[in-house]
Regions:
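Sequence-structural signature of mature extracellular/luminal beta-sheet repeat domains
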Residues: 1-352
Length: 352
């Protein structure tokens, strides 16, 4: 895709919210092959946009414990570090600058959600191989877990395993579009209402009959998820094994993070892939007299009110994930091709 300006509109107090919470919003857009970094310029009180070319960017995760920003592109898992304040010759000072530190070549295993423990253990979903993986120094990836309905590791995207979250520093909950065990089974007719949330530790399904569940996140002792096929954000009642719908958003939901008492949610225009033709979200939006949107929503998890939103304009149509970087302002991600990286030197402190 040719270069393009980032164009968006937002509600009146979106900038105030972003400034008050002093955070960066890092969003992956795989249809434009970019990651967008949104923050507030303290001088102008306007939103600063920075876009970084990342080929088919999907899962993205920020760990406050390690200060790693981890994201996927086609064939790689990238680990970036925040190196603090740097000046840009054209755009001035950026307080937070993420530069490349490591890369793991995995091949195109269709990385979806990515997580990191507080001790630096990295886990990710390979939708292609229907499993939870870890980076490997000796292979494309190291399998960590696969669903009990999948009988072997095969590059067949059988059930479209997509989402994952950690609890107590280990992978605990995953989301899957169905429980099929054949090549592309999730794409077959009748599978879109058979999504599940699975507890890896307890080895059981904790919620089923979901329409394309996505983005499980453990926050404030609740398991939050999004049902992309219906447009509902909510949580799983683990005692009743049911999905509690909390708020409807006119978008194809994917991408969720939290800060304070807010859920920060991303969504895309409804999918036109034949595999998603049975989903209700498009009709639900139409029946409500709404327009489908691609953007970011700020939702209060105490009241379930949507308090702020930012909508992207063309050509941004699809987002996958979002990471909230706290205690940060006016940030950017430097591209591997950025020549300034050749003259940035950081000496690790000797612990002795």
């Amino acid at each position: 895709m040719e270069d393009f300006p980032i164009s968006h509109s937002h509600t009146r107090h979106f900038t105030t919210w972003l400034s008050d919470h002093r955070c960066l919003l890092v969003v992956s857009s795989y249809n434009t092959h970019h990651i967008f970094t949104l923050s507030v310029d303290p001088k102008t009180f306007e939103i600063t946009n920075w876009k970084t070319h990342v080929n088919r960017s999907m899962g993205i995760h920020y760990s406050p414990a390690t200060q790693n920003l981890i994201f996927s592109n086609v064939g790689n898992l990238m680990i970036y570090k925040d190196k603090g304040e740097l000046d840009h010759p054209q755009f001035g000072k950026f307080e937070n600058n993420f530069i490349p530190q490591f890369a793991y070549f995995s091949g195109d295993v269709d990385v979806h959600d990515v997580c990191e423990s507080s001790t630096g253990e990295i886990y990710y979903i390979s939708a292609l191989f229907s499993c939870v993986c870890q980076p490997s120094k000796n292979g494309s990836f190291k399998p960590y877990w696969r669903p009990p309905w999948i009988d072997k590791y095969a590059a067949e995207d059988r059930c479209h395993l997509n989402g994952m979250c950690l609890v107590d520093d280990v992978p605990r909950y995953v989301t899957s579009t169905c429980t099929g065990n054949s090549m592309g089974a999730w794409r077959h007719s009748g599978q879109q209402g058979k999504g599940v949330v699975y507890d890896i530790v307890e080895n059981k399904i904790v919620c089923d009959n979901l329409k394309n569940p996505h983005s499980p996140r453990w926050y404030r002792d609740k398991l939050w998820i999004m049902e992309s096929g219906t447009g509902y954000f909510g949580y799983v009642d683990l005692e009743k094994c049911s999905f509690v719908k909390c708020a409807f958003l006119p978008t194809f939901l994917r991408g969720l993070d939290f800060i304070d008492n807010y859920a920060v949610i991303t969504g895309s225009h409804p999918r036109h892939d034949p595999a998603f033709k049975e989903l209700l979200i498009g009709k639900e939006i139409e029946d409500r007299g709404l327009d489908p949107m691609c953007g970011i929503w700020i939702l209060n998890i105490d009241t379930y009110d949507i308090e702020h939103q930012l909508m992207f304009n063309e050509p941004v149509k699809e987002l996958y994930d979002i990471a909230v970087v706290p205690n940060a302002n006016r940030g950017r991600i430097l591209e591997l091709s950025d020549q300034s990286l050749l003259n940035l030197f950081y000496i690790e402190k000797n612990k002795n």
